[in-house]
UniProtKB/Swiss-Prot annotation:
Record Gene3D superfamilies: Transcriptional coactivator/pterin dehydratase
Reaction equation(s) it catalyzes: (4aS,6R)-4a-hydroxy-L-erythro-5,6,7,8-tetrahydrobiopterin = (6R)-L-erythro-6,7-dihydrobiopterin + H2O
Protein name: Putative pterin-4-alpha-carbinolamine dehydratase
CDD domains reported for this sequence: PCD_DCoH_subfamily_a (cd00913)
One function term, GO molecular function aspect: 4-alpha-hydroxytetrahydrobiopterin dehydratase activity
EC number(s) reported in the record: 4.2.1.96
Keywords: Lyase
Top-rank lineage group of the source organism: Bacteria
Family assignment from sequence similarity: Belongs to the pterin-4-alpha-carbinolamine dehydratase family.
The keyword Lyase is annotated on this UniProt entry: yes
Length: 112
């Protein structure tokens, strides 16, 4: 398990700080397959995972759903034939919190 994936998520409040530009740059180095992007004015992390068929994509989606429920932090998930697109951000703060990077790293671990 990566160092980032092994970290604990913290309960997030509406007044929690978003990651700074410096933190963003540091954390992105730990999850190089993810892309930061702005959607409807909110910074998010996005990654597309590819699979051989829909069954594998759906199985990954279900594992990710279990992970999200365990942490009570939920991504946007688009499951299609042969691919799953995952977006992490913290709805309460309208952007990225350290938890999103931890969950992105844990999402990567689901492939191992």
């Amino acid at each position: 398990m990566s160092e980032l994936a092994s970290q604990q998520c913290e309960a997030c409040r509406a007044d929690a700080p978003k990651v700074s530009e410096q933190e963003l740059n540091e954390l992105m180095r730990l999850i190089p397959d993810w892309q930061p992007l702005v959607v409807k004015g909110e910074l998010q992390l996005r990654r597309e995972f590819t699979f051989r068929n829909f069954k594998e994509a759906l199985a990954f989606t279900n594992r990710l759903g279990e992970l999200a429920e365990a942490e009570f932090h939920h991504p946007a998930i688009l499951t299609e034939w042969g691919k799953v697109t995952v977006s992490w951000w913290t709805h309460k703060i309208g952007g990225l919190h350290r938890n999103d990077f931890i969950m992105a790293a844990r999402t990567d671990e689901l492939l191992k």
